[in-house]
Amino acid sequence: RAHITNQRTMEVLRDLGIEEESHRYATPWEHMGDSLFTTSLAGEELLRIRAWGTGDERKGDYIQGSPCGLMDLPQPLIEPIIFKNAAERGATFACNTEYLSHVQDADGVTVMLQDRLTGREYAVRAKYLYGADGARSKVLDDAGLKVEGQLARAGTAYVIFKADLSRY
């Protein structure tokens, strides 16, 4: 699950009034830093790179880019803060719920959902539909929206494998 909270997200948390509360549960930006590549948890270090703008080379870019820094706050810790704040503003939530489809009209949107625990399908009427369903967004596809531009400059893939390399 997600854990690095970028500067744009921090700006949103500030706008929502929950930046300070979020910091209480996070690893602060100044304690973030190196990404290590090792043969095991205590094994040989293969590579160390500065990350998240904490090195001298990039920190200024990050500081100029936003009034907010980054933090490392795992999704299971930030979600309750966001849910509590939204509930205090009148929002309701349905966990273990899958988006199925939606129909938009001039007054809002009707969203079809399925309770993943019971299998029950039901409709919810809303003013807005916000899709936070990831890179292969069904909401985005169903709305007929296209993502333009290039992917980020770099991608990350973590691979763990075991192999007998003793003959080498």
Per-range role (PLM):
Residues 39-42, 113-118:
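Short acidic, glycine-rich loop/turn motifs
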Residues 95-110, 114-116:
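A conserved short coil-to-beta-strand element within the FAD-binding core of flavoproteins
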Residues 117-128, 132:
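Core beta-strand elements of the Rossmann-like FAD/NAD(P) dinucleotide-binding domain
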Residues 160-168:
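Flavin-dependent oxidoreductases
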Residues 1-89, 103:
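Active-site-adjacent segment of FAD-dependent monooxygenases/related oxidoreductases
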